[in-house]
Amino acid sequence: MRSVSSAGGGSTYNSDNADSLLLAFQSTLDLIADEASTMVSPGVAVNQSQRFQHLDEMYFSLFKPLQNSFWNGNLKRYRVGIQGGEATFYDAAGSNAMSGSDFSASARSWWSRSVDGADIMLGGARDRLQTSSRRLYYTAAPGGSLRQFDLNDFTNAQLLLPPEATDAVRTNVANELLNMWGDPLHSRPLMVNYGGTGSGENFVEDNIVFVSTNAGMLHAIDTSNGDEKFAFMPYEFISKASSYTVNRLPLAGGNKRQTYGLDGSWSVLRVPGATIQDAPEKVMIYGGMRRGGNSYFALDVTNVTSPELAWQISGSTGDFVDMGQTWSTPKVALFPGRVPVVIFGGGYSPADHDDHKERRSQDEKGNAIYVVNALTGELVWSAGSRNANVQETVPEMTHSIPGSIAVVDVDADGVVDHLYFADLGGQLFRADIDGSASANHKVELLAQLGGTGENHRRFYEQPTVSYVREGNKSIYYVSLASGYRSHPLDVDTQDALFVLRDQVPFGGAEQTVATLTDFTNVSTGAEPDTTKRGWYMPLNKAEGEKSLSSPAVFNYEVLFTTYSPRSAADDESDPCSVSYGQSYLHRVDLLTGEGERSTLLQPGLPPGVTVLFGENNETAIVVGTETVSADSPDDDDDDDDEPNVRSLRQGRWMQLTPDGAGAIKQP
């Protein structure tokens, strides 16, 4: 494998005294460089006319940190070309858009009227608001119907303005609401197809990309020209409009932001039309708030110029009393009875993990999973440890579950059979979904991989499930990596990558709960013991190394990124040196754990891995704005000794008829 980069890209602040060192550190804004940055994987979509490859369009969520709680953001589009197993990003003029891991100063992204380079205030979807007016929809109460914004409908109090606020101040609030772009810090762009024109090689897709920001808005962008079709701002944020516009709050103590918004990623339910040219019969999208709050929103965007709020679910009430901050990206699937559902974890509990490094016996919020009807939002099934609040009581579900849920369909009938999820107590679970009329769903604790002290491992992200055929055995390999996302500077925890073998879904014998002793430590050079439950690899090559995203599995490899707060500075011997830290890409064999680690150019917290599929079976691996060869380190033509490995993808609900089966559309 070619090296991802030849040198580290860490940024360092030097100081000759403790006071100025503190100021220098605070200016790093939680390890995010003071430049155009991205912390989520780029948005990509499947080609509707060539279902086994991606479109050549890449969408980057970009932001620039400021010395207050409001950060500016943008969405930019580039073209991606794959050749020789590596990807290249091109600008609108056809030139290489990158200089190292940064956007070239001479690059002009799609939709931009002039060169915009790495400046997030120029070009992109943000720039298009200069030439088109924003259609802003809001809810006047939680869960209320959508209304189009009109300043005359609001009192000063409804905008969080003082009674004496003048008309000029009110106008400034309105102007900001109709023009601002906040930071899409954790929101990965979601592209949805709305049909198209032409056929074959001349087929031109009509696509919309959705992304949300910490300014409290969801944006729907026409990919052909960058124009905004609409923006949505729920009551929870428009009722505090002054905080996002004319009275932006400073950073609080400890360099913490005080203002968040719709910072989650979105998922889609899409019912296709009769042909790929036809508009879909139904499009609904689902997303949460992360640190912005404890609600999920479902929008009917079948008519993208006239969205409707289908439903809103909020934590701490009714069936969702245990739900915390909504970090888990919803998964759309079919439940038994072919009921379209949305599946998500119980969320994040800031009271238990923001300021408490010790392991608690039970988190206040988030220690549950939920399955709701995708069309109505009504609860279908839930599981957790508090029996009065959930349908299935699982005493071991004591810690919050901010990650997404891995959805598995064993028999390829389109209906969920198993769910895999992990929690902030270092535990891994599997839910077995009963397809019979009794609907006797159950949850099994598979592994306890956390503990106290240096073993207090937290799983913030979704496990990755791969199907492996070993001789006459079918096995699921479940990959997950730990890391204290809420405290990336932590150096006290021994984090690790774990790969667990699970044969129970294929009729294997039930197993006891696995602990660390049931896994082979492959960092010692030992071969995985097939009599054990799996293997693990301590992240100990750099101090405080941790993983902050889900692994990807491709070509018999587990690919995942890590971050170390201490390893980037060449002058670490200088006690007055503070670094952004260093990010890495790991590529290890799924079955044996053998592999290598490469240094990434981009400083700070890295996004996860994206595997791109292009024309002529070309593939490439992308990490944020960097690319690496998709060839395995030990790639050769003789793979007779390799078992059959297939990485499982989440199911999506598609309404199919026998004559329409060839027209499946998947965003």
Residue map of PLM features:
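A fold-level detector for beta-propeller and closely related beta-sheet-rich head/sensor domains
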Residues: 1-667
